[in-house]
Amino acid sequence: MTRPDIREPGDIDAAWLTAVLAEGGVDAEVRSFTARAVGTGQIGDSVRFTLDYARRGEGAPDSLVGKFPAAGAESRATGVALGNYLREVRFYQHLAPKARVHTPRIWFTDVDEASHNFVLMMEDLAPAEQGDQLRGVTLDQARLVTVEAGRLHASHWGDDGLDDLPWVSGSKAAPSSPVGDDAVAMLWMGFKDRYAERLKPEWTEVGDWVSTRYSWLGQRHDGPRCLTHNDFRPDNMMFATAAGGYPVTVLDWQSFAYGAGPTDLAYFLAGALPGDVRRAHEDALLALYLDTLRANGVTGYGMADLRRHYGQGAYLLFLTAFFAAMVVTRTARGDDMFIQMLGSAADHMIEHGALRD
């Protein structure tokens, strides 16, 4: 059977879905299907395809979920400019099998390196449900994610082989970022103007500090580097429900990097837990993370270094919040989410004394 080509959601037909199943090793024939948008992605759009079979072979799924470039022109242009689409496909093709973190099974994925058009057909993780940045997570869910973070980071801890891969953000082989210090400062000024009535004075002070230190903040980490997610938040995870599903699955690998592992942890805990809950359980969660690193082979990294690197890490959540707000298609939910992310990150940075040159 001919290998599937790269298609937009509206161009998909039963024959194409049959070819996708064949790529995954299933001999079946799709007769018809229904398609429904799912998820809350800012850069990519996801669609659930519920399948009806003329011939259902062994292992044929009831449904698949496809991910595609965002339909919104502004969001799509951002995904292309930042290399998000190419990066996610390459992650699943080359790094996911060794990453130790739970990711969805991929039935088929491909990307056009010239246009960055892509398709990612994955298992439907229902009845698991997508996390919600605005709702946050429970403490039990935070513990699950902390363990997943430790496993992910241990998988490529100090692995300088990642430096040779141009599609790994932060690697030595990666092309120069299209975003520079001046652009970040301008985006912050635009964000500050747009959301002035929703910003606390101390958040604005943090933003003025972060926005004038963009390059320096990206280079400040002085510890081992590892494979990081770089957008490690509930919206990019699926959690089990009473009806079933994997305990937690990590999605949306568009921003992964060779970077500082504790930054992922700060990014998640600062944004996903209420401040009082995070403060009450932060020490235990850091200990759980360090124990997971050690259980997965990491040596020579102690709690003092972890606390320092974790305390510095929430800057990326703050930066992502105002940067993304200004370069993706605007929505009401997006407005609320970016303010929540930014405020939580600012509070974390102030608490941990991160505003130091």
Residue ranges of each PLM-predicted region?
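Juxta-kinase regulatory segment immediately upstream of eukaryotic protein kinase catalytic domains
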Residues: M1-F33
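Short amphipathic beta-strand and strand-loop transition segments with alternating hydrophobic
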Residues: R31-V38, W107-T109, S215-W216
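Conserved ATP-binding subdomain of kinase catalytic cores across diverse folds
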Residues: G39-G180, G261-P262, M303
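Active-site acidic catalytic loop and adjacent metal/ATP-binding pocket
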Residues: T40-E58, V65, S211-G261
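Glycine- and acidic
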Residues: E74-A77, Q130-R135, V250-L251, Y267-G275
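Active-site activation/catalytic loop segments of kinase-like enzymes and analogous catalytic loops
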Residues: R90, S255-G297, A314-G334
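ATP-dependent phospho-/nucleotidyl transfer catalytic cores
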Residues: E129-H229, M238-G244, R333, M337-D357
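All-alpha amphipathic helical-bundle segments outside canonical DNA-binding/catalytic cores
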Residues: V298-A314, A345
